[in-house]
């Protein structure tokens, strides 16, 4: 029997999940649940309202929650966990412990299993950090993001008065990447290691100097970063910045014995951030389904799912072909 999937929300991430489910031999998409009325899905799967969610209890094995981290998932993941096993991509790193505790309480009471903070960071990058630090306990870890579009930062710029549209790219500084690859351990954090590159379409009568200042002084987004603001036309933005690429690097530079150095590097280059994140969610939905079948309840992360459980291959096939 196929794993029955539901999707909550229908933005770019949800469409990425929808596309990935179509590629899976052991899954079927039951429906999309949205606050918006009358939407049409790419695959033609039926759409329902958020109020319909409880009616599908027992008809969906895993709900994939595709809302934003700032306001949606904080509320929606615990709410939907009352009825279903769920997976989300909650990515506000500082609030993960709080989100985990809230979801864990609900899931244990409901006897459901929910996996939070899945994707590529948090998610795939999180796993690589743990592997690298376990293998090289004496060393230093680094994470770089980009070059890619930061959707949250782009949205933050678009909320500024006088801004019609915007894209913000996170760009890793190459000098630090090269130093680490050479076995060095530079003193660099996320702020120092990245450039924030902004492309902004301003209204004709907007005060561009004021907009630039608002961007550069925005707490939790741009303060502390080297930030460059470029004002361009809507035509230029549509022509040159229409995609949603992203990527990044996890590196660890360390020693096994004095003077014997090793560098571990894991990298991603993504044409579409939401499509890749959606693909990760779908793979881990399979792992979560299997965990729940083994009696798991409560809240989990990618650290808790055995790699074999996210694969469509049997244990025998994995040993024969991937080990």
Residue ranges and their predicted role:
Residues 88-89, 114-118, 144, 167-168:
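General beta-strand structural signal in soluble alpha/beta enzymes
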Residues 124-140, 155-165, 287:
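Oxidoreductase and adenylate-handling cofactor-binding alpha/beta cores
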Residues 90-114:
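Rossmann-fold NAD(P)-binding glycine/threonine-rich loop
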Residues 4, 15-16, 23-53, 149-285:
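C-terminal substrate-binding/catalytic lobe of Rossmann-fold NAD(P)-dependent oxidoreductases
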Residues 10-11:
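Glycine-rich Rossmann-fold phosphate-binding loop(s) that bind the pyrophosphate
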Residues 53-62, 70-89:
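Rossmann-fold NAD(P) dinucleotide-binding segment
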Residues 258, 262-323:
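NAD(P)-dependent Rossmann-like dehydrogenase/reductase catalytic/cofactor-binding core
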């Amino acid at each position: 029997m196929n794993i029955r999937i539901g999707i909550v929300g229908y933005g770019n991430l949800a469409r990425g999940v929808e596309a990935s489910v179509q590629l899976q031999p052991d899954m079927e998409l039951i429906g999309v649940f949205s606050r918006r009325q009358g939407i049409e899905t790419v695959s033609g799967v039926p759409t329902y309202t958020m109020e319909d969610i409880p009616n599908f209890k027992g008809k969906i094995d895993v709900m994939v929650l595709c809302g934003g981290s700032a306001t949606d998932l904080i509320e929606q993941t615990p709410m939907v966990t009352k009825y279903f096993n769920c997976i989300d991509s909650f990515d506000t790193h500082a609030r993960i412990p709080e989100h985990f505790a809230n979801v864990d309480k609900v899931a244990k009471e409901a006897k459901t299993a929910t996996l939070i903070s899945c994707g590529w960071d948090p998610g795939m990058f999180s796993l690589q950090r743990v592997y690298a630090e376990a293998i090289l306990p004496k060393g230093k870890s680094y994470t770089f993001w980009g070059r890619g579009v930061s959707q949250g930062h782009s949205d933050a710029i678009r909320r500024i008065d006088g801004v019609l549209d915007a894209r913000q790219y996170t760009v890793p500084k190459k000098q630090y990447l090269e130093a680490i690859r050479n076995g060095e351990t530079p003193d660099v954090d996320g702020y120092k290691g990245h450039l924030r590159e902004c492309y902004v379409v301003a209204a004709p009568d907007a005060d561009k100097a004021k907009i630039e200042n608002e961007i550069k002084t925005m707490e939790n987004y741009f303060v502390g970063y080297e930030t460059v603001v470029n004002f361009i036309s809507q035509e230029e933005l549509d022509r040159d910045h229409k995609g949603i690429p992203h990527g990044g690097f996890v590196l660890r530079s360390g020693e096994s014995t004095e003077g014997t150095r090793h560098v571990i590097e894991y990298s991603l280059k993504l044409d579409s951030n939401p499509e890749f994140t959606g693909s990760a969610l779908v793979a881990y939905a399979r792992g979560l389904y299997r965990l729940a079948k083994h009696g798991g309840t409560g809240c989990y992360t990618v650290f808790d799912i055995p790699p074999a459980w996210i694969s469509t291959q049997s244990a025998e096939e994995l040993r024969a072909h991937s080990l």
